[in-house]
Structure formats: structure tokens, C-alpha cells
Amino acid sequence: MKSNKFTTSQLTILGLMAGILFLMAYTPLGYLNIGPLAVTFNVIPVAICAVVLGPTGGAVAGAVFGLTSYMQAMGIGGASALGSALFQISPVLTAVQCFVPRILDGICLGFIYRAVHKKANTYVSCAVTGFFSAFLNTLFFMSALVMMFGNTELIQNLMGGRNVIIGCCMMVGVNAISEMVSSTIITAAVGTALSKAHLIPASQIAKPDTAA
């Protein structure tokens, strides 16, 4: 039976990543504003937690990411233009918008890393996890946005009268590509370093590494 208990070192990493998420959320380190949506690098700590701590760690980090987003939507410590606008429409739905996609992202990433590691080494597994961290975050976030706010005047104006799928693609555009590239590279580098430091538990590794 696999143990779900985290070591002190792994909990330290979780705490560190949570701290980094708050730091990135309230400094220029975490967001690059391009168009109506910002490029976010906060998906990277979520991916790293999923690599080191599995679905549970990914979910916790995703929840922290969601919390920072919701606080920004409320105007606490910084403001998100889109988040603030959604909050004015519905604080409850905005909470769902902020938390659910990020938590689902973290959970999925933990399983993705485990699955990929059955066939590939740590570097490749971390790179794939980093890519999907940004990809799934965008997919889940935009899906939730369309489902809950798609009929609002705000989103209709952002779509510019275009088809929903085309409008979403145009909204994310360069932002999503930038997130995927940066998350892939950084998660691969950090995850490999943590693996060499023996901070990724056996439950996350399906077989011994064939390459570092």
C-alpha cells in the first residue's frame, strides 16, 4: 500500500511553492499583461507540487493559486481587470471560476506525471507535466468562463461577436503559448533537480530513471 504521508522536505517544498505563488501573484513576477488576459507563470509552482507531491499536492497548490486569483478579483493586494469585472457580476461564480479550474489542473498534473514516468525519464516527464499545467489551466479556465459567464455582456464584448471557440482562441492566443513554453522549460529543470535531490517520492515514480 502506498503511503500518502509527506516527508518534512516535501512539506517544505509545498510551503515554499505556496509562498512563491503569493509572491508571484502580487509582484510583476507572476503576470505579464497582454490584452484582456494576462500571461500567468503561477502554473509553474502548481506543476512542481504535482511532480513532487502527486495529485494531492497539485490540488493544494492549485487551491492557493485560486485563492490569490480570487483575492485579486476582490481587489485585495492588487487587482485583476477581468477578475474584478466578473466579481461585480457574481462573487460566487467568480469563486468557482478562480478555484475549480486550478484545483482540477493540479490533480490532473499529479496523475499525468505518474503516467508519463512509466514510459519516460524524469526530465521528459517533468517537461510534459509543465506543458499540461499551462494547457489544462487555459482549457479549464476558458471552459468555465464560457459556461458561467458566456452570455454576459462582458464576455460577449470580449468575443467581439465571433464564434465562441474562435473568440476564446483569439483571447488566449500568444498568452497561452508563452505560458506553455515557459512552464515546460522551467518545470523540467526544477523537477529534474528535485529528483536528483531525492525529493520525489517512490509513489510518484513508476520505475527507476534511465536518464536524469
Language model features with spans:
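Loop-helix junctions at membrane interfaces
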Residues: 1-212
